Amino acid sequence: MNFERVKREEADTVLKLYRSLLGTPYCVWTEEYPSEKEVEFDLSRDALFCMRDDAGNIAGVISIDDDPNVECLTCWSETMVPSAEVSRVGVCQEFQNQGIAGKLLKGVMEELKKRGYQAVHLLVAKDNVKALRSYDKLNFENVGEC
């Protein structure tokens, strides 16, 4: 598996991956979100990454988000700046439970370090035990609920 930036011509593949996860356990996404708009926004900022299998297929995706509504939450550390939001983590169902989410998180954190970020934050549904387990393994700290 390799961590790479998603190519612009793969936008439809990413959107199909998002759609394939609708209705699965712990997924709070809808038909309206994430949409082509979010995929294009992420691609325009070189902020959409993936894990690829040995055949080059996308196994999972992750993005670096830029949402002012999330940035203004008061729970984030004011000493760890600049910080970035990690968002839209999704793993194809056939690749789930193989550590792909953890690899995506590690890869994006390395990318953020190269870009000069000091910290990472994210939002997750409090009942999404699979995601919470991945974040716990990487020593993420729960700083609040909203």
Regions found by a protein language model. Give the residues of each.
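Acetyl-CoA-dependent GNAT
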Residues: 8, 21-88, 92, 105-106
